[in-house]
Amino acid sequence: MADLPQKVSNLSINNKENGGGGGKSSYVPPHLRSRGKPSFERSTPKQEDKVTGGDFFRRAGRQTGNNGGFFGFSKERNGGTSANYNRGGSSNYKSSGNRWVNGKHIPGPKNAKLEAELFGVHDDPDYHSSGIKFDNYDNIPVDASGKDVPEPILDFSSPPLDELLMENIKLASFTKPTPVQKYSIPIVTKGRDLMACAQTGSGKTGGFLFPLFTELFRSGPSPVPEKAQSFYSRKGYPSALVLAPTRELATQIFEEARKFTYRSWVRPCVVYGGAPIGNQMREVDRGCDLLVATPGRLNDLLERGKVSLANIKYLVLDEADRMLDMGFEPQIRHIVEECDMPSVENRQTLMFSATFPVDIQHLARDFLDNYIFLSVGRVGSTSENITQRILYVDDMDKKSALLDLLSAEHKGLTLIFVETKRMADQLTDFLIMQNFKATAIHGDRTQAERERALSAFKANVADILVATAVAARGLDIPNVTHVINYDLPSDIDDYVHRIGRTGRAGNTGVATSFFNSNNQNIVKGLMEILNEANQEVPTFLSDLSRQNSRGGRTRGGGGFFNSRNNGSRDYRKHGGNGSFGSTRPRNTGTSNWGSIGGGFRNDNEKNGYGNSNASWW
């Protein structure tokens, strides 16, 4: 990949006569120079057959007769749960022998079929955990601040972890804890609140699931109030609640929870918008000990009286900064402060994210009590495991440049980011017509379509995924080797999170971005990120930076950038109001992000988060 920019330049991708922006072109992409015609010709569909973006699956599904699309998926998840989740283990614990009897946890019997479903086949070359390079984590710096910080653990052991959980961790082939897990496990098992900042792919999900399950396995279920035991007043009484900004992230956390609750009494459930609420309510009715939810859907269930938070022992906010940035603060405050959830003194609260700017830390004081602040690695920065390449490509030449890039280097899974839903559909159709196996996810897709697309991408059936910002945060897609920013974001932190989809779990990856004159607002941010990750800075970017500096241009990059260097520091040590023991009056009203410092604006219309029909509700 070292000579990739030279390869691209030799292919004359910036020649406007090559038709990069559409229209009739004599340009022959490299990947077609040695190929025949496409294996199928795309005819103009009838009006009733027209579909948008990623119709590769639907067209092929009509050809093969599978209602589930090209991949033959015969069943939809119906709100994140399917028949697969009721075949034993964590989802059907009563019939699998795993139970809580007389204050003792009795694990259920082993189930080979379920183990293969949850953990994969260990000798499979595509087995998920086999590619994790744990040794690459050893030199990552960690800073923990607060009163009486517990000593970190060095390996997975019992204690502090539960023995059954240890068996499940071994089944998942996790050999040693990541830096965030080394600190979070003893912190949580000691009963402390936690705010943890760690870069993407650092094991944040295990950082809260492992200690949480350890405590649940040992303490057992909380009693259900007598008045709630009649059939007509049935509702879920979870012991732990995990809030996530998007349904993709919620589903991902749920899938991990299924693994580590295998053979235990704990039954996880997931609820999110964009799926039938009736199916989700029935799943909660069957028993819910750990609830993973998006804020909007959880509020809906609370209003319907289908969920009570009275038994919550553990509250987790994952990707907390993104939830607040997306405008979920009123919903989160309603859930935490205005429903029947125990007070901050009577529960444990954990907040995990890749960035925590100072103003978000101030807000977090309302949800945390005497917490420990944990900063792992260079928070808000990119990993040196990711090779970053910035190419200058005009808008009209992007399609040609993309074909050249995919032809020059297309091994493994490629994730392509665009700014709009329309472009996601158009680019996916374009790639399909060029004989690439591509699919797309964005907010206008149905839940079934998005799950099929993600499943196909993870299984390497479709090796190119075109995505909008909905997939930029939190998704753990294994084995992504190349991230392409077809459209660069206007916010430099979005750039960081996008390219963080590769180079995860200690592995290496490549991130290529198409830059042009429309992206000058993030020049300074790109320069700093490239320099701090020891990456090569293109000459054109250095020239633009000097020009902007002389011209006095605004170079903040939007969003959190102006406080990037503060995002990994505990404001209690480095200034700001308050100290380790300080409290402040709770703000129970709704807030307007425009009145809070730190660069927050009403940018929802630009990134798709302002749509009332947004998919994460």
Swiss-Prot record:
Keywords: ATP-binding, Cytoplasm, Helicase, Hydrolase, Initiation factor, Nucleotide-binding, Protein biosynthesis, RNA-binding. InterPro entries: DEAD/DEAH_box_helicase_dom, Ded1/Dbp1_DEADc, Helicase_ATP-bd, Helicase_C-like, P-loop_NTPase, RNA-helicase_DEAD-box_CS, RNA_helicase_DEAD_Q_motif. A motif (Q motif) lies at residues 154-182. Pfam families: DEAD (PF00270), Helicase_C (PF00271). It comes from the Eukaryota. Its EC number is 3.6.4.13. ATP binds at A198, Q199, T200, G201, S202, G203, K204, T205. It catalyses: ATP + H2O = ADP + phosphate + H(+). Residues 7-17, 79-90, 580-594 have a biased composition (Polar residues). GO terms for molecular function: ATP binding; ATP hydrolysis activity; DNA/RNA helicase activity; G-quadruplex DNA binding; mRNA binding; RNA helicase activity; single-stranded RNA binding; translation initiation factor activity. Belongs to the DEAD box helicase family. DDX3/DED1 subfamily. This is ATP-dependent RNA helicase DBP1. The gene is DBP1.
